[in-house]
Curated annotation (Swiss-Prot):
One of its GO terms (molecular function) is serine-type endopeptidase inhibitor activity. Putative acid-stable proteinase inhibitor. It comes from the Eukaryota. The keyword Repeat applies. The lineage of its organism: Eukaryota, Metazoa, Chordata, Craniata, Vertebrata. Residues 27-74, 75-121 form the WAP domain. This is WAP four-disulfide core domain protein 5.
Length: 123
């Protein structure tokens, strides 16, 4: 009986170590998100980081334009953005860049014409 208890414990520990974190983040990945990409690739330079642990504690390793580098992480609000069913006829400038630009529970969402603050999708 003692053998099977020990065996079961070892199996559970082995399997548990293979599961992703409860938050859905990879091991070593910091909370928060990367800011939206800031434009096209103009000049390619070597990556400055490969993962969040290589950045100061308030930053994340993010891909921006051509390479990965440490940038300030941004707050991500709960809920997803609603699906945009419209086709843009006249693109507008972005009304937000990140969730913290939006009031209350609203999220900064990509739409067919740009980014704007919207209530999160239900479901």
């Amino acid at each position: 009986m003692r053998f099977w208890s020990l065996f079961l414990l070892v199996v559970l520990l082995a399997v548990g170590g293979q599961l992703p974190a409860a938050s859905g983040r990879k091991k070593g990945e910091r909370a928060g998100a990367c800011p939206p990409e800031d434009g096209p690739c103009v000049i390619s330079v070597p990556d400055q980081c490969q993962e969040d642990s290589q950045c100061p504690s308030t930053m994340k390793c993010c891909f921006q334009a051509c390479f990965r580098h440490c940038v300030p992480r941004i707050l991500v609000k709960r809920g997803g953005c609603p699906e945009d069913q419209l086709q843009c006829l006249s693109p507008t400038e972005h009304l937000c860049n990140k969730d913290s630009d939006c009031s209350g529970k609203k999220r900064c969402c990509h739409t067919s014409c740009g980014r704007e603050c919207r209530d999160p999708a239900r479901g």
